[in-house]
Structures are given as structure tokens and as C-alpha cells.
Design a protein with these regions (language model features):
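Compact, glycine/acidic-enriched structural inserts
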Residues: 112-145
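A surface-exposed partner-binding patch
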Residues: 1-99, 103-105, 145, 163-174
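Short, surface-exposed, charged loop/turn segments at secondary-structure junctions
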Residues: 102-107, 114-116
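Generic detector of low-complexity/intrinsically disordered segments
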Residues: 14, 20, 104, 133, ...
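Glycine-rich, aromatic-bearing surface loops/beta-hairpins
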Residues: 121-123, 133-134, 147, 154-165
């Protein structure tokens, strides 16, 4: 049984790795994003917006800004990766995004890394086999680099990361 987005958020909050937004507009954001996505929205994305995650470690969440009046709404961040069948959910702070896959149909969507170098044309590598697993991996990212963990350390947290269909795991991406 896999971990849910809410469970992952609770784990990370208990560790002090997760910071929440205090905006309180989750329902409006969910409605607005669902409309932008043509009426369909992955359950994990909805769960992330309900959790109102602002950041995990140094990684900022991409939270759409809700506007009550439709004429005040802007395209915003939601549309940045739609050409690549994804929705941006986190920034790496260097202009790149982690995006939740929208091309997975009825399967639980994976998370991929999108590089600004190619204008986010395609996913470069798999960042998590599910949104919940991705959140746990993201919280370990900087520590893993500092410790010099070997390639594939991610499998200890996300045993299915190397099975993501649209891009290889980071240690296989080259």
C-alpha cells in the first residue's frame, strides 16, 4: 500500500521540513485549476492544494493564486507545462520545475523534472513515481547531496521511481 499525499505531508511537517501557506483559498484554487484543466484534475494534485504546502525544505511549491472574479484570473503557473502534459508543483529555485504528469490516464501520476534550458519541452527525469513519494524524496534532496549518497539512493524511499513511463530516473538520465 502506498502513502497518500496527506500522510507524506504529516510526516514532513513532523520533521520540520514542510511549511504551509496560510492563504486559506484551497477550494477556490482547486475549482480554478480544475476548470483550466478541462474539468479533470488528478486526485493527488487536489490533495496537494488542500494541504496548502508552501515549501519543502528550500523548494517552493507552485501554488496558483485564486481570484474570485473570473475576469481577474490570469493564466499563471498552471499553464506553464500544459504543452508537455504536466502541471508545475515545485520550483528548484533555478528556473526549473517539478511537474505532475497529466498523461497518465487512470494511473497514479508520476512527478518529473522539467528544465528551463529547453523551455520545459519534455520531462528530463523522473522525480517520483507518485506525488506523495516525490514529497518525501524532495525533503531528502539536499541532505543526500551533502552526504554524497550513491546513485539510486532514491529507491529506498520510492521503489518504483525507475518504472516511471515518460522519463528515466535521475541516475539513468545521463
Amino acid at each position: 500500500m502506498d502513502i497518500t499525499v496527506s500522510e507524506a505531508c504529516r510526516v514532513l511537517e513532523a520533521r520540520g521540513a514542510l511549511r504551509r501557506s496560510r492563504r486559506g483559498d484551497a477550494e477556490g484554487v482547486i475549482q480554478q485549476v480544475r476548470e483550466r484543466l478541462g474539468g479533470r484534475m488528478p486526485a493527488d494534485l487536489e490533495a496537494l492544494y488542500r494541504e496548502q504546502v508552501a515549501s519543502i525544505g528550500d523548494f517552493a511549491a507552485i501554488l496558483p493564486e485564486w481570484r474570485e472574479r473570473p475576469e481577474w484570473r490570469r493564466e499563471g503557473s498552471v499553464g506553464l507545462l500544459l504543452h508537455a502534459d504536466a502541471v508545475p508543483i515545485f520550483s528548484d529555485g533555478c528556473g526549473n520545475f517539478y511537474g505532475l504528469d497529466l498523461a497518465s490516464g487512470d494511473q497514479r501520476p508520476a512527478v518529473y523534472f522539467f528544465d528551463s534550458e529547453d523551455m520545459f519541452e519534455r520531462p528530463h527525469w523522473a522525480a517520483g513515481s507518485s506525488l506523495a513519494r516525490f514529497l518525501l524524496l524532495l525533503a531528502e534532496h539536499d541532505q543526500a547531496l551533502d552526504e554524497g549518497r550513491p546513485p539510486g539512493w532514491e529507491l529506498s524511499i520510492d521503489p518504483d521511481i525507475d518504472k516511471c513511463p515518460r522519463a528515466p530516473a535521475i541516475w539513468l538520465a545521463g
